[in-house]
């Protein structure tokens, strides 16, 4: 154990606190700036009115309208294009085709099935 004595670092309490203060003082301007920015530029969240109101059914309806609208149609077209390119290069498999076509059927068929089962228009 005596061989480890010469490698032992003797830190007193004052030098340890000085080292910590030197390390922390480097971050002080950033912390103060971040606190000031968050206090003085606070405002209402931009996502608080994304649901279109307080009704959860309205929020779900807005999401369904987004997915089944032009965005969903673009995704379906891109999926079919990806299958065509994969088929052209010989990389298409039955699993890939079934996954993409099945996803398209589920995405657009769920709305029709839900309206049929609930009696909606």
From Swiss-Prot:
Where it sits in the cell: the answer is: Cell outer membrane
TM annotation in the entry: 65-85, 94-114
Secretion signal, residue range per the UniProt entry = 1-19
InterPro entries, alphabetized:
TrbC/VirB2
- UniProt key word Signal: yes
Classify the protein's membrane topology as the record does.
Multi-pass membrane protein
What is an annotated GO biological process for this record, any one?
protein secretion by the type IV secretion system
Q: Name one GO cellular component term.
A: cell outer membrane
Q: Which key words tag this protein in UniProt?
A: Cell outer membrane, Crown gall tumor, Membrane, Plasmid, Signal, Transmembrane, Transmembrane helix
Decide whether keyword Transferase is in the record: no
Highest taxon of source: Bacteria
Q: How does it assemble?
A: Interacts with host plant RTNLB1 protein.
- What's this protein's family per the entry? Belongs to the virB2 family.
According to its UniProt entry, what is the function of this protein? VirB proteins are suggested to act at the bacterial surface and there play an important role in directing T-DNA transfer to plant cells.
- This one is known as Protein virB2
**Gene field:** virB2
């Amino acid at each position: 154990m005596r061989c480890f004595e010469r490698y032992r670092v003797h830190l007193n309490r004052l030098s340890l606190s000085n080292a910590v203060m030197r390390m922390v003082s480097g971050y002080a301007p950033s912390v103060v700036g971040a606190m000031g920015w968050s206090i003085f530029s606070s405002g209402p969240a931009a996502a608080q009115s994304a649901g279109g109101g307080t009704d959860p059914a309205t929020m779900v309806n807005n999401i369904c309208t987004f997915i089944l609208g032009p965005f969903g149609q673009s995704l379906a077209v891109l999926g079919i294009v990806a299958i065509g390119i994969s088929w052209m290069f010989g990389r298409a498999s039955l699993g890939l085709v079934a996954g993409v076509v099945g996803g398209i059927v589920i995405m657009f068929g769920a709305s029709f099935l839900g309206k049929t089962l609930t009696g909606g228009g």
